[in-house]
């Protein structure tokens, strides 16, 4: 285990730098940037600023969100279909490359973790027990890799991911590109999340829908999640820890 003082709850259920990047500069330390709308241009979130998700925030098709090592992201409270989440739509990318000494933390606004804690090497929440859950949604990554799904008509190549209303077409996943690339994720911790919307309809700590094997996912920690830690819906991605 690479985080000290945090217990891990992890279950699963099989069901380049661009010159046009938008750089969000740090506010006064510790500083908070409230993210209220979808990410529609290449964007970098920098360590030293807390990024606060004010709802379901989508990295749209053709766009890359880069998160620097050691960055803190916090989700506002939300329940059911309105649960706060970071959603990477098909064709979007999340490059979140943390390290063992500078992990990227996704947690709740109720978590008092700050950059002073991180600088001291204290990565665990200073105020929330590791069993506290359901305070926000989670991270959802969707791709174009093959899936096994059907509806009333028969077999289909794309479906809506659970936890996202059908009115949001960014929730579609699946396709025929096994090598699809949704980015790189290393050394991230997802904490105190999960949302149960209905029977068989949840937001997990990390949801992977039709994610291709061009995507790299390594060393993911899920702490205190209401539903599954990581849940796969088809796809061909390999995940290692």
Label the model's feature ranges.
Residues 14-241:
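Beta-strand/loop edge motif enriched in small/polar residues
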Residues 9-12:
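C-terminal motif of bacterial Sec signal peptides marking the signal peptidase cleavage site
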Residues 1-7:
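Sec-dependent N-terminal signal peptides
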